[in-house]
Amino acid sequence: MRTLTTSNLEPGMIAAEPVVTPLGQLLAPAGTEFTRQLINRMKLYKVESAIVLGEGPRDTDVEAEPKPAARVKTHAEKSKTHSQKVAASDEFRDFQMQYFDAIDYLRNVFTSATTAHYTIFVDALVNSVSDLFRSRNTIVELFDMLFNMRIISDSVYSHCLNVGLISRMIGRWLKLNKHDLNILTAAGLLHDIGKIKIPEEVLNKPGKLTDEEFAMIQMHPKYGYDILKNQSIDPRIKKAALMHHERSDGTGYPSHLTEEFIDSFAMIVGIADVYDAMTAARSYRAPLCPFQVIANFEHDGYQKYNTKYILTFLKQIAAAYQNNRVILNDGRGCNIILLNQTALSKPMVQMDDGTIIDLNTNRDLYIKSVI
């Protein structure tokens, strides 16, 4: 093995160890072949060097002791969580590379769109993420991948990418035609473009925002609309940037619109936006599991969101996890066996001893995590 500066890396070399950013974000796992794209991404993330496999006696030393490592790995495999198994899969490795490619493209669109005479091409934008949704037809498959990407990348760009993908999934459930699916996907991808006008120290502040800082954040929908308003793109994309924080009951921002004045795509993107935010880790809380998010939506979502859109979303999310193994808040594991249509966050579960518990009638119990 040998250490090379990023500028001396060449396509075809193999990473001997994971490639990580100065902030600890994984760019590529060990064993990845360096491509020109990956090397450029390393420069973008200010990764100064990498350890690569190379000629020499140390390579022999590295390969001379595979058996003990293999035995440890086999033992560890037995105790891996579902998330860890996903992260170790070839499918996730492919998804990860496609995801970073999409992030790079989206970052370029965001920064370029603030300059004069830049044209956003919706077809190219949607095509930049097409590999991420074409081969993943179920919400569980997609969310498994997105959950593991959070550990690696949790930026405005990754959030917008997630919202674009989730919005498209909702559009599929609503049986939108392909053209509208593409417009909805683009609306999700661009919904937070206005945040590029917000100082990073405010966007990434770990603690509670001051009133002044929160007021600054609340300007991002208007900033986004201002960036997009002169683009020759579908008006629904512009409206999604402006209205995705509006709520049906008039409690949203920036204009406190009620449902009849909110664009339908903005309402769909708003649901995807909140779901992605709730399932992300924050300095003040751990990420919420899907059933905790459903419970939050059930608590106040029916009046804040379009009924058709929110019920379609919640029913599909809950149904996707039927028969999954989950952990309750008291630490016990069980399997979801039947959904409660009037309380989707409180399904019936079967314990390991065969006992069936209706969480809707056992109000002290709730699903804490999906495994």
What are these regions (language model features)?
Residues 1-116, 287-371:
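Terminal helices and disordered tails flanking the catalytic cores of nucleotide-processing hydrolases
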Residues 74-215, 228-231:
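Acidic/His-rich, divalent-metal-binding segments that scaffold phosphate/diphosphate chemistry
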Residues 59-61, 189, 206, 246:
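Short secondary-structure boundary/hinge segments and terminal tails
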Residues 163, 183-197, 215-310, 319-321, ...:
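Alpha-helical scaffolding flanking metal-ion-dependent phosphate/phosphodiester catalytic sites
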